[in-house]
Amino acid sequence: MGGSASSQLDEGKCAYIRGKTEAAIKNFSPYYSRQYSVAFCNHVRTEVEQQRDLTSQFLKTKPPLAPGTILYEAELSQFSEDIKKWKERYVVVKNDYAVESYENKEAYQRGAAPKCRILPAGGKVLTSEDEYNLLSDRHFPDPLASSEKENTQPFVVLPKEFPVYLWQPFFRHGYFCFHEAADQKRFSALLSDCVRHLNHDYMKQMTFEAQAFLEAVQFFRQEKGHYGSWEMITGDEIQILSNLVMEELLPTLQTDLLPKMKGKKNDRKRTWLGLLEEAYTLVQHQVSEGLSALKEECRALTKGLEGTIRSDMDQIVNSKNYLIGKIKAMVAQPAEKSCLESVQPFLASILEELMGPVSSGFSEVRVLFEKEVNEVSQNFQTTKDSVQLKEHLDRLMNLPLHSVKMEPCYTKVNLLHERLQDLKSRFRFPHIDLVVQRTQNYMQELMENAVFTFEQLLSPHLQGEASKTAVAIEKVKLRVLKQYDYDSSTIRKKIFQEALVQITLPTVQKALASTCKPELQKYEQFIFADHTNMIHVENVYEEILHQILLDETLKVIKEAAILKKHNLFEDNMALPSESVSSLTDLKPPTGSNQASPARRASAILPGVLGSETLSNEVFQESEEEKQPEVPSSLAKGESLSLPGPSPPPDGTEQVIISRVDDPVVNPVATEDTAGLPGTCSSELEFGGTLEDEEPAQEEPEPITASGSLKALRKLLTASVEVPVDSAPVMEEDTNGESHVPQENEEEEEKEPSQAAAIHPDNCEESEVSEREAQPPCPEAHGEELGGFPEVGSPASPPASGGLTEEPLGPMEGELPGEACTLTAHEGRGGKCTEEGDASQQEGCTLGSDPICLSESQVSEEQEEMGGQSSAAQATASVNAEEIKVARIHECQWVVEDAPNPDVLLSHKDDVKEGEGGQESFPELPSEE
């Protein structure tokens, strides 16, 4: 290219540009290779753990447009740089946002190549000649400008009244002209859309390669002392890397070439723009080849690492967490000090300046949507024509792409340029355009989702009567507006979060660059040699700084939401009505670790070990946060009873329990809240509630064998009475250990009517509830747990209302008085065959029904945890054991109505099985 006759760069200058480009790629390669490995490791980890984005969204997401969708086509006047003349061209813009110019419409239709193709990434659209001259002169450092007289001749003579200028940093500028102001407005609005999307669409990509490239650019620029955002990160990776090279080349080209240029100012400017375009094209060509080769090397490297990453994932995660702890200990104090002095005092004021224009822009989008839907509704009520309604709906679907109608919404956000002027001096953040354009893209996205959701919800009602269709239009509109309000709040909080971090992070990075960053090298010793490609101390350091700032920004955003500023919603508010399928895409896949109950529990429990929950959860609205007033049964430590195989005849079960925040590998999915710090385990054990908490009024319907419990309950009308001789035992227990309050005796007399409806199969559940008041036996930690829990007295009267409302739910009520059952699988209380037979004759059915399997397992796990809670409980357990053994022989059942003999027969067999399996359990030593 350099030696051609048309080239304005001589061969020496072209060779110089090639050399600088090659050196830049060589210097950039190590950064990209490191970040590629790190990003690939994170990608594999996300894939293995099946992590999902939990950001709630109620509007349905509109599918992307089909490739080649035409956004604009028209005939207009365009200035041709090659012949220095205006020509009539047929311009087509598709959804790749490239501006293609054809000789005429016929040439386009027959598939001819375009005369020119412009990608306006990084460009600026102007409609005033004065504004264009100011901008172009600012980027043309002419050394002769001061000695030259004022140039009154326009750079381009306009053939028509309404021009559109497209300024670009390293390309020749584009000039277009129109006869009508409406045509000018339509084309300029569309060009602005193209610039916005080309500037930011690449940065929105979630591929690990894109993330690796952007991280590499950030670290590459930091080594040169440039922190924070960069206005030249626009376009795709080839354009961004070419911009990096041109950033280094530009001073040299200006010094070498500008003084040698002759002629008038406009001629020199035109020559300079031609040189820049030629140099940039040369750089882009070489960058494209170099980056392609670099990617192939990185792919080959990660292909060899994939096996190591997958097999050592747990070790890699633990190693990184350990490194985070070490570096955070070093960074935390100076980082927090820098935040306290340079960031915290300004966060609230910056947020206030952001909220006004951004919120007014989203409000304008809402108003526009409502206005367009009202027009559709009024037209239909007038015409009653369903065919015309379909046409109006099609036009409504194209509303987000109608640049002229959307432009008033976008201009509301342009006020940020005036509001955030102080940022340029205080935080050295001159790139407000990036915040504005990103916000405008979010606004367009939300409008797309709103019109798509409206069309989807209305489509089933289009074939009915006209009156019903008109009513449906209004109802669907109101529903979509509610969903829009919630999604708007979520997106705006995300915008504020990103903007605040982007504005303030460079300040903290610069403050710590001289003190903390040099210390990072010594922490590399904590990384295993096999994992040096997947973990880098620089990345961990940046993550920690980002997290510290994120925590600070989330505080001010939450405060604004609590104060209801600009219609921001709180995270735990009652959510608006949503469509059935609005949340279906958010459901985690089957087997997802993140979606498992144990992981959800660990995410909301403070102090859970092993959790890597970062505070980026201002936008993650889990079920527990959405409806805090209705705690689920899982959140209280209860379990869903699933049909499963019965325990083996010997009475033993194998329960695999990992750490608290890991899922329990058994047929029952449980969530355990027994690990709350500072809480007595006896209050939080299965079925218990906190003192200040009200018991749940509604509980999710658990999964059980269909109809079995209901059918058996109808057969039984037995009521349980408290034997008189059990009173002394109760009194002794109350005086000795103070586990049963005095008011229990009164409440127990009031409960026989409720207990009458309880199926004998669920006697074990009562034992679980009664057992919780007793501190666990210290000997229980040394033996394998199995079977069913021991018998004890309740610690406090539970709420039994939930039992009557949800008969299939886990039992929270307790049997009255000292009436209790002797579990056939219990081996710790000695041989109890006689009592077991007696209880069978009295009509109490004992068995190993799988419906109670989960209660047994949860109780066993909680027994282990509760046994370590305090030394006082361990001491009291000796007396408790004596009382338990004594009480076992006093358990009696008084049955008024005999149950179904077939049911008793089947359960008698289960009892015999359980008695046979007693021998497999080690007996506890006598406490006498």
UniProtKB/Swiss-Prot annotation:
The modification Phosphoserine is found at S579, S582, S596, S602, S646, S708, S926. It comes from the Eukaryota. InterPro entries: Niban-like. It is found in: Cytoplasm; Membrane. Residues 580-596 have a biased composition (Polar residues). It is a lipid-anchor. Expressed in various types of thyroid tumor such as papillary thyroid carcinomas and oxyphilic thyroid tumors but not in normal thyroid tissue (at protein level). Strongly expressed in heart, skeletal muscle, pancreas, white blood cells and prostate with moderate expression in colon and spleen. Expressed in renal carcinoma cells but not in normal kidney. GO terms for cellular component: cytoplasm; cytosol; extracellular exosome; membrane; plasma membrane. Keywords: Cytoplasm, Lipoprotein, Membrane, Myristate, Phosphoprotein, Stress response, Translation regulation. Residues 580-600, 618-654, 669-707, 723-877, 899-928 are annotated as: Disordered. One of its GO terms (biological process) is negative regulation of protein phosphorylation. Residues 801-818, 865-877 have a biased composition (Low complexity). Its main location: cytoplasm. Regulates phosphorylation of a number of proteins involved in translation regulation including EIF2A, EIF4EBP1 and RPS6KB1. May be involved in the endoplasmic reticulum stress response. Belongs to the Niban family. This is Protein Niban 1. The gene is NIBAN1.
